[in-house]
Amino acid sequence: MAGLPVRDPAVDRSLRSVFVGNIPYEATEEQLKDIFSEVGPVVSFRLVYDRETGKPKGYGFCEYQDQETALSAMRNLNGREFSGRALRVDNAASEKNKEELKSLGTGAPVIESPYGESISPEDAPESISKAVASLPPEQMFELMKQMKLCVQNSPQEARNMLLQNPQLAYALLQAQVVMRIVDPEIALKILHRQTNIPTLISGNPQPVHVAGPGSGPNVSMNQQNPQAPQAQSLGGMHVNGAPPMMQASMPGGVPAPVQMAAAVGGPGPGSLAPAGVMQAQVGMQGAGPVPMERGQVPMQDPRAAMQRGALPTNVPTPRGLLGDAPNDPRGGTLMTVTGDVEPRAYLGPPPPPHQGPPMHHVPGHEGRGPPPHDMRGGPLAEPRPLMAEPRGPMLDQRGPPLDARGGRDPRGLDARGMEARAMEARGLDARGLEARAMEARAMEARAMEARAMEARAMEARAMEARGMDTRGPVPGPRGPMPSGIQGPNPMNMGAVVPQGSRQVPVMQGAGMQGASMQGGSQPGGFSPGQSQVTPQDHEKAALIMQVLQLTADQIAMLPPEQRQSILILKEQIQKSTGAP
């Protein structure tokens, strides 16, 4: 011993240390330290553990401050009984013990010990896993505890330490997996996700090798902060962890368990955890926005779609379409087909509140509409209103004039005002129109009634009422009811169908024709008291004219129900008037 060069620090350390053998497996370093402190202050005591099993090998090394104390320990403590075993205390500088010390890298206290033998980056993950697995549970727990404190107290220093020692970060992650603080799957994801994180490793850049080395350390940092993200994901993992997932490499080789603890004691990577986690989150977020955008793109204004659906393809005058179309459940109306203008357009001021939708301004002779004779006029055009109200307001066929009250009609149309406007726009003489329409069908009312009865029992009745009731505006038995409360209008209700809102539109055209015809026929049959033709009569006459003048193409575009009712009406009118 005396011949050994004392100038070499490593040798000096070995001279100050003693080898302790035959240690009971259940003994702890603290207990042994207490025993060896009897001869003098102990700098460090270290038990040696099997890296494969993590169990103690039954021997260790005790380092004193000077060689004299070490010699005293060998003299006084050799053979000391502890837990039923006689401790063997020998010189740590012996050839055999020297080799042991060298392989374990225990030449100095834990805090000062080097990393140990260097290994290739490819083998680093496995080495780290073995080193971590060899740590006894209590030591592993202590390691995590120290790391937590380090991160809490010195986040930046801890971060730097882990960045510069990726193997430590990886070991901490592995330890968390073994302790079931972090789920193995999550650990793998963290490692792989952060491969793009630059690693600031000093010395050998062994970090990367299978699962994103650089990222490994950083990732672990996240997890090192047990309190942080890692603690959140609790999963179970086998003790040895997944070396494959750990791709950070140890520059110096596997840190000894004690060394790791010491290293952990250093500043903690507080910010690391956040950074790693943030990155993972960011990656995920990236994908999030895209789907959303995609979802948004398809979004369209529902109203636009409705309007489009409503627009008739061949409507000559789309002017009123916008107004009507959107509400038309069928996506189209007579009006749209006939190219009529939006009823509301010519209505002028909005209907009074008590009035319903101006839809049934059916009079539809909008200024822009074709001349009264043009059946395409607004009248038919707006079946929707009727749909809304099965009773089809303005078309109250039962009352001679549309609704004697005109504007009071639930739709709020001022029949008279509308008619006046419509007539003016067309430049038609109200009376002339009435004369024409009524004359043409003066006799027709009764004939129509008979035919209509076959196709539309209700309509026939309504017509009959009109044809027979010469009193004109005076409400007949089925006359219009008080404003806003219309009983079922036979005409408005589909033929034979009880006020089905869906048929109302169809019948509206027909009903209107019938009504106007009847109204028109009344001029001839007006009783003395009714020498005047009311605006409603003109309105109805105009409606009939519009229906009659619908072209075959326009009729073909209508829904089957409307088309059928209009064809029947035209046929009946032609038969009754003898028109071609």
UniProtKB/Swiss-Prot annotation:
Q: Do the record's keywords include Acetylation?
A: no
Q: What is this protein called?
A: Cleavage stimulation factor subunit 2
Query: Whereabouts are the sequence repeats?
Result: 413-417, 418-422, 423-427, 428-432, 433-437, 438-442, 443-447, 448-452, 453-457, 458-462, 463-467, 468-472
- Please list the residues that carry the modification Phosphoserine: 14, 521, 527
Residue numbers bearing the Omega-N-methylarginine modification: 308, 471, 478
Where does the sequence pass through the membrane? Answer: none
Q: In which tissues is it expressed?
A: Expressed in most somatic cell types (at protein level). Highly expressed in testis, except in meiotic spermatocytes.
BP term (GO), one: cellular response to nerve growth factor stimulus
Q: Which CDD domains match?
A: RRM_CSTF2_CSTF2T (cd12671)
Annotated RRM domain residues: 16-94
A Pfam family the protein falls into:
CSTF_C
Q: Which GO terms describe its cellular component?
A: cleavage body; mRNA cleavage and polyadenylation specificity factor complex; nucleus
> What PROSITE patterns would the database entry show?
RRM
Which key words are in the record?
A: Isopeptide bond, Methylation, mRNA processing, Nucleus, Phosphoprotein, Repeat, RNA-binding, Ubl conjugation
